[in-house]
Amino acid sequence: MALLVWQDDLNIGIDVIDQQHRRIIEMLNHLHVAQASMQRAAVGEVIDEVVDYTMSHFAFEEELMEEAGYPFCAAHKRVHEVFIKRVSEYRMRFQAGEDISDELRTMLSRWLFNHIRGDDQAYAEQVKAHLNQFAREHQGGGWLGRTLKRFFG
């Protein structure tokens, strides 16, 4: 499988989320490189990084949706929970000695692209409108800046 390339149709129009999605794609490419170089320890590190980062990303995304009053936030959160469970199962299989790199990378790339193009695009307009309104009311970063700092340092 070749390296993944960011495509314009993956942009949802919320810069911070688009940057996080790009970072996840970079991680998937690191997984490919680690696997190709037969570095099992590096593969494990990337898997851990993907799980940890996506959990933070999901929590951030869910908070944005909740703040914006997105009506399908609970359903979107369930999709995230199922994804985390699935990836955690891959991590356990890897820790048990199984070579899951190809299977995991294929699943992650398909899931991520489909999730961004479908589920994430669905909330984007409502969240953008909320962020724009909030920015007009609270010049200087406010809630978004605090939330970014809380999740990503």
Swiss-Prot record:
GO terms for molecular function: iron ion binding; oxygen carrier activity. Disulfide bonds: none annotated. Pfam families: Hemerythrin. Keywords: Iron, Metal-binding, Oxygen transport, Transport. This is Bacteriohemerythrin. Fe cation 1 binds at residues 21, 57, 61, 120. InterPro entries: Bacteriohemerythrin-like (IPR023504), Haemerythrin_Fe_BS (IPR016131), Hemerythrin (IPR050669), Hemerythrin-like (IPR012312), Hemerythrin-like_sf (IPR035938), Hemerythrin_metal-bd (IPR012827). Fe cation 2 binds at residues 61, 76, 80, 115, 120. NCBIfam families: bact_hemeryth, hemeryth_dom, PRK00808.1. PROSITE patterns: HEMERYTHRINS (PS00550). Oxygen-binding protein. May be involved in a storage mechanism or for delivery to oxygen-requiring enzymes. The oxygen-binding site contains two iron atoms. It comes from Stenotrophomonas maltophilia (strain K279a). Monomer. Belongs to the hemerythrin family.
